[in-house]
Amino acid sequence: MQIFVKTLTGKTITLEVEPSDTIENVKAKIQDKEGIPPDQQRLIFAGKQLEDGRTLSDYNIQKESTLHLVLRLRGGIIEPSLRQLAQKYNCDKMICRKCYARLHPRAVNCRKKKCGHTNNLRPKKKVK
């Protein structure tokens, strides 16, 4: 039977499979066509992520069904300079003592009307 695999770029891949094929086999066929390693592939059908050991018939995937291919996210270490920039952006803030608005680091007055644009500010507490 024929099924379709739609990638995030919008490209549609056509695969010839059997209902008894496992998800691993489908991922191997995608690797043959697209060169994406199976360990980086995630297949979605009807809002569910498909598990490697199961078959197409387990998920009731029939002829001309469309699977969605997304790539697995990889975690890692942030470069130190980017980490400092992110920390500066997220942590170096001033907080209004009346309305708790987050303001830029050099703020003198609050930008919110509800506290009367008070100048009663404090630095944001640092996370330990």
Curated annotation (Swiss-Prot):
The protein's assembly and partners: Ribosomal protein L40 is part of the 60S ribosomal subunit. Interacts with UBQLN1 (via UBA domain).
Keywords per UniProt: ADP-ribosylation, Cytoplasm, Isopeptide bond, Methylation, Nucleus, Phosphoprotein, Ribonucleoprotein, Ribosomal protein, Ubl conjugation
GO biological process, one term: protein modification process
Result after altering residue 65 to D: Phosphomimetic mutant that binds and activates PRKN
SUPFAM superfamilies to which the protein is assigned, alphabetical: Ubiquitin-like (SSF54236)
Effect of residue 65 to A: Prevents phosphorylation in case of mitophagy. Impaired translocation of PRKN to mitochondria
Highest rank taxon of the organism: Eukaryota
Residue numbers marked as site, Essential for function: 68
Protein name per Swiss-Prot or TrEMBL: Ubiquitin-ribosomal protein eL40 fusion protein
Organism of this sequence: Homo sapiens
